[in-house]
């Protein structure tokens, strides 16, 4: 029992606050934007050039000032990413008292959630965590997964999503539907968008499933 429950969060419309303006804070901001967060505020006395660039582009909001205890109450997620341990501790305490989820970049176990290492391929998201015990191990496994699940999975996942929606409308038999989707998941990484339209693919999958069952 490691005490962590894995979950995927939908961040659209969710206020996220990052306290800190250095490289660690920048990584947190980029991770949030990659996950679709659209309400990100960064609070610090100064910022990395990349954070400033994102603010100029309207992707995030920056507040060039010191952290105030009331800041955490305005968020759903808070990231304590400063280079001051005592300030990070106070941010985590403020979040805990307000019932807000807080991530401490300097001491993961002292926050209420941690960030896994992530591989993204379109809508495919593969996450791995060592529960804070060894970030280096998580990173190594992430690199292995990145090699195993290459860029081809971006198109594969998109096609599987389209196929699933079509199958739900066209195949009434639940068992057949399940078998078709499982077979499609096996085939998709070896296919490309030029391999034909979705309806033809469905027909071929149904025929292959029928042959398996006879």
Please tell me what each predicted stretch does.
Residues 53-73:
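Glycine-rich, highly charged phosphate/nucleotide-binding loops
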Residues 83, 104-154:
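E1/E1-like adenylate-forming module used to activate ubiquitin-like modifiers
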Residues 1-54:
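Hydrophobic, well-ordered beta-alpha structural blocks that scaffold small-molecule cofactor pockets
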Residues 13, 73-74, 121:
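Alpha-helix C-terminal capping/helix-to-coil transition sites in glycosyltransferase folds
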Residues 44, 62-66, 106:
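Short loop/edge segments at beta-strand edges and connector loops
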Residues 77-83, 88-115:
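ADP-ribose/adenylate-binding Rossmann-like module
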Residues 132-214:
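An accessory alpha-helical subdomain
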Residues 23-24, 86, 132:
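Residue-level detector of alpha-helix initiation sites
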């Amino acid at each position: 029992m490691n005490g962590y429950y894995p979950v995927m969060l939908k961040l659209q419309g969710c206020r996220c606050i990052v306290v800190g303006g250095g490289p660690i804070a920048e990584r947190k901001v980029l991770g949030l934007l990659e996950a679709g967060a659209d309400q990100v505020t960064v609070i610090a006395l100064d910022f990395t050039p990349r954070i400033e660039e994102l603010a100029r582009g309207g992707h995030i909001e920056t507040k060039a000032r010191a952290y105030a205890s009331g800041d955490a109450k305005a968020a759903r997620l808070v990231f304590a990413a400063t280079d001051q341990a005592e300030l990070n501790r106070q941010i985590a305490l403020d979040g805990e008292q307000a019932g807000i989820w807080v991530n401490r970049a300097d001491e993961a176990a002292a926050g209420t959630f941690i960030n896994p290492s992530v591989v993204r391929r379109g809508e495919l998201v593969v996450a791995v965590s060592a529960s804070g015990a060894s970030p280096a191990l998580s990173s190594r496994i992430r690199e292995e997964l990145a090699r195993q699940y290459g860029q081809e999975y971006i198109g594969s996942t998109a096609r599987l999503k389209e196929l699933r929606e079509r199958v739900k409308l066209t195949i009434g038999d639940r068992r057949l539907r399940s078998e078709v989707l499982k077979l499609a998941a096996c085939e998709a990484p070896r296919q490309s968008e030029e391999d034909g339209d979705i309806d033809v693919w469905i027909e071929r999958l149904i025929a292959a499933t029928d042959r398996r069952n006879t």
